[in-house]
């Protein structure tokens, strides 16, 4: 049986017991609490053995990576502080991995959100993973470690470079030969809380979008995607035109900030 562990990222957590109970967590959990002090504690909350790491550093992807490095599980479940897990989720995840021994990463459904692949078990390709959110992601930890894959710390909430860190993470997994599958089970419900990074479709959003898409896709595909994305979002744009959105995205593609950051860190 695959041992599972939830990797929960949060900020300024005061009561870990309340968090665990509110989220209906019943399995072992690592909490990365980004706050203003460093600390560590262990506690048993119901059936869950919970290890909480309090750290001063900021950034969602840094939180994810710390949790991965501290985990001792076979299978890890990515989690934020606004999720409520379905009853029996741990057994469902274990069943999914037992029935798909070839899967290195399994993407689950979220209650109240579109089920893109219906009730089918499906191996996911490049286009499929573009719409995956972090809450849906589970993975075999040892497979990730063996390939040296982590979340890109230049991306995600707190980085100043926008989001799409899940897409970057999954594309790196695919490039490394890891197999990604969808399994039809509603893992959790996600609250409709305000995003920590999305402030609307403004200039900053589209410039960041251009930077991230070029970083992940490369130059030719990112330009094509910029045109598609501006057109797809045209009805949601209130303060800028579709053509402005496209031009801002192109500005981000030209800036190529993330590539330069990554190159400077290596």
Description of each model-found segment:
Residues 1-28:
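N-proximal low-complexity "stem/linker" segments adjacent to membrane-targeting elements
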Residues 54-71:
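Glycine-rich, basic loop-to-helix element that forms the pyrophosphate-binding segment
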Residues 76:
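Short aromatic/hydrophobic "clamp" motif used to bind/position activated sugar donors
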Residues 84, 88-121:
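Conserved donor NDP-sugar-binding/catalytic core segment of glycosyltransferases
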Residues 122-143, 160-162:
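A recurrent flexible, glycine/aromatic-enriched loop bordering the glycosyltransferase active site
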Residues 143, 154-183:
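A short, conserved alpha-helix in the catalytic core of glycosyltransferases
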Residues 157-161, 179-200, 209-212:
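Active-site donor/metal-binding and catalytic loop motifs
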Residues 200-266:
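Non-catalytic, C-terminal membrane-associated alpha-helical segments of glycosyltransferases
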């Amino acid at each position: 049986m695959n041992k599972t562990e939830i990797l929960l990222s949060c900020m300024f957590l005061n009561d870990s017991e309340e968090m665990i109970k509110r989220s209906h967590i019943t399995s072992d959990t690592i909490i990365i609490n980004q706050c203003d002090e460093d600390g560590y504690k262990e506690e048993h909350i119901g059936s869950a053995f919970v290890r909480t790491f309090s750290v001063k550093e900021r950034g969602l992807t840094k939180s994810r990576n710390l949790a991965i490095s501290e985990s001792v599980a076979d299978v890890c479940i990515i989690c934020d502080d606004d999720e409520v897990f379905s009853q029996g989720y741990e057994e469902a995840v274990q069943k999914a991995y037992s029935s798909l021994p070839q899967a290195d990463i399994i993407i689950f459904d979220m209650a109240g959100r579109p089920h893109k692949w219906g009730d089918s078990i499906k191996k996911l390709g490049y286009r499929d993973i573009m719409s995956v959110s972090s809450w849906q992601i589970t993975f075999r930890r040892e497979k990730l470690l063996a390939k040296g894959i982590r979340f890109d710390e230049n991306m995600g909430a707190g980085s100043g470079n926008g989001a799409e860190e899940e897409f970057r993470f999954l594309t790196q997994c695919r490039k490394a030969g890891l197999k990604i599958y969808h399994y039809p089970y509603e893992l959790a419900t996600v609250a409709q809380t305000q995003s920590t990074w999305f402030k609307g479709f403004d200039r900053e959003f589209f410039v960041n979008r251009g930077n991230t898409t070029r970083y992940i896709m490369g130059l030719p595909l990112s330009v094509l995607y910029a045109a598609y994305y501006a057109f797809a979002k045209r009805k949601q744009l209130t303060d800028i035109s579709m053509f402005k959105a496209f031009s801002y995205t192109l500005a981000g593609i030209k800036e190529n900030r993330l590539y330069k950051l990554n190159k400077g860190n290596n």
